[in-house]
Regions:
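Transcription factor C-terminal regulatory/effector domains that mediate ligand binding, dimerization
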Residues: 1-185
Length: 185
């Protein structure tokens, strides 16, 4: 898939024919790359997010099958500070995909609202919205909070996700400003 995308982008570049559809594909790919990259940093494999019944290895109340976690433990010394598990992550059973976001308060907001959230809808809105936009974009290293941007419509629909996460808006507005867009409030 990436080889075909690369070839098509190369052709359009040399034909001086920019295609905005490629930006949408690239932003979706970057979010997936970021989630998978942070999973790897956490010592988790892709099968972890494919298993609907998987539980985070950070939760002290659950035993994680070794098939989902490479060493059945994580190395705190090598985890970026932004991915260090919070008290909520350690105390509330949750799916490991929620551990992938580099904003601790955002992770806590998601975990605390688990019962009332359609996680399939949330995941779709993050990765592949029906309106053609993505809810989150990643512009750099996935473990760096400043690499992540939330879209305007995502903030409107899922405002509680970033409640108390002022830095998310600061970083998002930085990226929006670089593209000449108005800042989020």
């Amino acid at each position: 898939m990436m080889a075909r995308f690369d070839a098509a982008a190369y052709e359009r570049y040399y034909a001086a024919d920019p295609c905005l559809d490629h930006l949408l594909t690239l932003t979706k790919f970057n979010v997936l790359r970021a989630v998978l990259g942070n999973l790897a940093t956490l010592g988790l494999g892709i099968q972890t997010i494919e298993d609907d019944d998987a539980l985070s290895p950070f939760n002290s109340t659950t035993k994680v099958p070794t098939s989902h976690h490479r060493d059945n433990h994580y190395e705190r010394s090598i985890l970026p500070a932004s991915l260090e598990p919070t008290t909520t992550q350690r105390s509330v059973p949750h799916h490991p995909w929620l551990d992938c976001f580099p904003h601790p308060r955002m992770r806590d907001n998601l975990i605390n609202a688990l019962e009332g959230v359609d996680d399939c809808e949330l995941c779709t809105d993050i990765m592949d919205s029906a309106n053609g936009d993505v809810g989150l974009m990643v512009w750099g290293d996935p473990w760096l909070p400043q690499s992540w941007e939330v879209s305007e419509w995502f903030v409107q629909k899922w405002s509680w996700v970033i409640e108390g996460c002022e830095e998310v808006l600061v970083y998002s507005n930085y990226w929006r400003d670089r593209r000449g867009l108005e800042g989020l409030r």
